[in-house]
């Protein structure tokens, strides 16, 4: 059985919910929200002063409206919306995820995290056991861990199918098998292992839930089957914006009886996609092109060669992108700066690199605009703008940002200003009231 690691590479205690160490700058959700909002403002200011083309999006996400001009007149109120669009997105969702319309049903939910929250809090109760299979080097997303904890269920995470199978055999089948084929850190479970996990013998009450937020990467880059073609899946969610040209939304599909049950709570709590979002998702799923992702992956493979020549195995292929975990970014920076122990932690290091690449070169990565609890990893996704930049410019920008990280390893005031803005060292950071025990990391 895989136990949670209690400290990071530098001995800092890991928060078991988010899976990384909290720092003295990014202490929790409040500060991570400030960093995210600052990055959004930086993008806006750059576009206003230098134009939209001055920003190079390496986030792997689109998050535009996905709506055509001809559709806008039908979104002026719910009356024309119902006539033109109601019920037309769900068939695309079923097809996109490889589901069977005679057995499955779809819902469009406002976020992947909202889908995780509502599904898991509906299906689980105190005393239930959840076995989670996550990639080696990765983790189940906090937006799934939090609702499991909230209802009092027991969460056990495994990083190999052998360990999962051993626990299954010794302890019996759980209430829920939760599989994350690709983690937020862009680690990937081999297809054969996913299929093996889904084939484990189940009790009548055992359900299989796949948090397939990155399904588009699996299909486009890894050439794997769509979610419901993997095996006996009861419920699953994928993203409408991760390597898909749609708005931020969760495409939630599953057994018709379960989706009906969960759907009632979706409407109770106002988690359903709204009109414009609903239409944008339909367009994104209808026009989904795996070849675009494959081309991004080929560029990522070229970038990997360049970065591994500088950083060795610390740079790894994260599907159609290249990643360096925050702890490794700290080690690289320490080596260059010839400095000893730092008080910065991985999430701060990854954030500083991301904010520097944005400020200096207009390169927008997940680490700058990610929601709280996103994995502390430098992620360079080649979709959508990697080809516009080219490998050498991306590598040069990363190198400069790592040098900057090295210079601020022992300068907390400057590090804080990079992450939170010039007012941060004066104690003027924005305060967002979020209870840490219940805050949901949104995707």
For each predicted feature, which ranges?
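N-terminal glycine-rich, Lys/His-bearing helix-loop that initiates the first secondary-structure elements
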Residues: 1-62, 308, 319, 415-443
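Conserved C-terminal alpha-helix-loop-beta "cap" of PLP-dependent enzymes
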Residues: 2-32, 316-417
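Conserved PLP-enzyme active-site core in the AAT-like
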Residues: 6-17, 88, 92-293, 304-311, ...
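Conserved N-terminal alpha-helix of the aminotransferase class I/II PLP-enzyme fold
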Residues: 26, 32-118, 142-147
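Short, mixed-charge, low-aromatic patches
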Residues: 40-52, 70-76, 215-221, 234-239, ...
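Short, surface-exposed, charged loop/turn segments at secondary-structure junctions
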Residues: 79, 251-254, 338
């Amino acid at each position: 059985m895989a136990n949670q690691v209690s400290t990071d590479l530098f001995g800092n205690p890991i928060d078991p919910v988010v899976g990384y160490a909290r720092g003295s700058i990014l202490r929790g959700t409040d500060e991570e929200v400030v960093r995210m909002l600052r990055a959004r403002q930086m993008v806006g200011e750059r576009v206003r002063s230098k134009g939209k083309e001055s920003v190079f999006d390496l986030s792997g996400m689109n998050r535009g409206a996905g709506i055509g001009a001809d559709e806008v007149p039908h979104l002026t109120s719910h009356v024309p919306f119902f006539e033109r669009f109601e019920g037309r997105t769900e068939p695309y969702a079923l097809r996109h995820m490889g589901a069977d319309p005679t057995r499955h049903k779809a819902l469009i939910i406002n976020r992947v995290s909202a889908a995780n929250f509502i599904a898991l809090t509906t299906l689980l109760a105190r005393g239930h056991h959840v076995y989670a299979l996550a990639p080696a080097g990765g983790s189940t997303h906090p937006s799934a861990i939090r609702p499991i904890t909230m209802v009092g269920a027991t969460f056990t995470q495994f990083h190999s199918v052998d360990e999962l199978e051993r626990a299954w055999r010794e302890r019996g089948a759980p209430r829920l098998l939760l599989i994350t084929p690709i983690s937020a850190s862009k680690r990937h479970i081999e297809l054969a292992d996913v299929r093996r996990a889904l084939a484990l013998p189940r009790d009548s009450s055992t359900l299989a839930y796949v948090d397939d937020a990155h399904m588009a990467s699996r299909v486009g880059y890894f050439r794997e089957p769509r979610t419901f073609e993997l095996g006996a899946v009861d419920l699953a969610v994928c993203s409408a914006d991760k390597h898909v040209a749609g708005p931020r939304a969760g495409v939630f599909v599953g057994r018709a009886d379960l989706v009906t049950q969960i759907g009632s709570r979706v409407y109770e709590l106002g988690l359903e996609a709204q009109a414009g979002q609903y239409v944008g998702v339909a367009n994104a799923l209808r026009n989904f092109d795996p070849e675009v992702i494959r081309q991004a992956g080929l560029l990522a493979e070229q970038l990997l060669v360049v970065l591994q020549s500088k950083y060795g195995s610390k740079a790894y292929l994260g599907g159609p992108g290249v990643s360096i975990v925050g702890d490794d970014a700290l080690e690289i920076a320490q080596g260059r700066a010839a400095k000893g122990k730092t008080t910065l932690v991985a999430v701060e290091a990854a954030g500083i690199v991301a904010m520097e690449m944005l400020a200096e070169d207009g390169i927008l990565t997940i680490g700058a605009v990610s929601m709280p609890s996103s994995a502390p990893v430098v992620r360079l996704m080649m979709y959508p703008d990697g080809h516009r930049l080219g490998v050498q410019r991306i590598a040069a920008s990363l190198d400069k940002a790592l040098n900057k990280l090295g210079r601020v390893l022992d300068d907390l005031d400057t590090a804080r200003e990079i992450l939170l803005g010039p007012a941060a060292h004066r104690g003027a950071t924005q305060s967002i009231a979020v209870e840490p025990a219940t805050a949901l990391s949104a995707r």
